[in-house]
């Protein structure tokens, strides 16, 4: 029997289905709407994301604040990998600043918008309306939230976190550290690859 569920970004919906908090039909409705809103909320190709390799989120946050950069951390994937979001022009202008501060690699990602950033605020508000229509169920197996990396089986807390996920940071590093508190001895990744297993190995 599983001890806890968690998923990365879109994968959190899969985790909610696996944990029986939501049925697969309702999850599919939310996922479809989420995708539509994320791609229609901002003009295509004016915003994006970039992966920064070699520094942790605390360090990247410091560089952003010190240099008044107009980008935000979207994904705290591991102590050595952080993804930022923002307008394309702001991502480009930040690249050399990050290199000057010791970043090893800066990789612009092939995405259409600045996901998990404040540029998704309007889309998030619309998605909340859809989430409010869904019938969620309580479950005795907890889930670790992307939004605040807390362990929850309380359905109100889970819904609150889900409502705030789209426009905020995915706290994957903190989530895995929280997982360690459950004394979990085996992690099973379910998905098309082994990306998360690779990230977990670095945490």
What are these regions (language model features)?
Residues 8-17, 21-22:
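Glycine-rich nucleophile elbow surrounding the catalytic serine of serine-hydrolase chemistry
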Residues 8, 109, 190:
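Conserved residues at the C-terminal ends of beta-strands
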Residues 1, 164-203:
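Flexible, low-complexity segments
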Residues 9, 13, 50, 88, ...:
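Gly/Ser/Thr-rich beta-alpha loop segments that engage phosphate groups in nucleotides
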Residues 11, 52, 84, 116, ...:
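Conserved small-residue
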Residues 1-6, 84:
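Helix-rich "cap/lid" substructures immediately adjacent to catalytic or cofactor-binding pockets
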Residues 19-168:
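Alpha/beta catalytic cores of group-transfer enzymes, especially the acyltransferase/condensing modules
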């Amino acid at each position: 029997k599983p001890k806890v569920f968690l998923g990365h970004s879109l994968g959190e919906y899969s985790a909610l289905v696996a944990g029986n908090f939501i049925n697969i039909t309702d999850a599919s409705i939310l996922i479809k709407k989420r995708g539509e809103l994320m791609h229609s909320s901002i003009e295509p190709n004016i915003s994006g994301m970039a992966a920064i390799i070699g520094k942790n989120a605390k360090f990247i946050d410091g560089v952003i604040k010190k240099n008044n950069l107009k980008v935000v951390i979207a994904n705290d994937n591991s102590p050595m990998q952080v993804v930022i979001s923002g307008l394309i022009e702001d991502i480009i202008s930040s690249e050399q600043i990050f290199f000057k501060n010791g970043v090893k690699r800066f990789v612009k990602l092939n995405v259409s918008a600045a996901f998990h950033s404040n540029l998704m605020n309007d889309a998030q508000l619309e998605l909340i309306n859809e989430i409010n229509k869904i019938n969620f169920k309580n479950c005795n197996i907890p889930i670790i939230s992307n939004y605040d990396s807390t362990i929850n089986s309380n359905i109100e807390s889970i819904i609150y976190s889900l409502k705030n996920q789209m426009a905020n940071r995915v706290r994957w590093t903190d989530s895995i550290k929280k997982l360690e508190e459950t004394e979990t001895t085996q992690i099973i990744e379910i998905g098309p690859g082994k990306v998360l297993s690779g990230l977990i190995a670095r945490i």
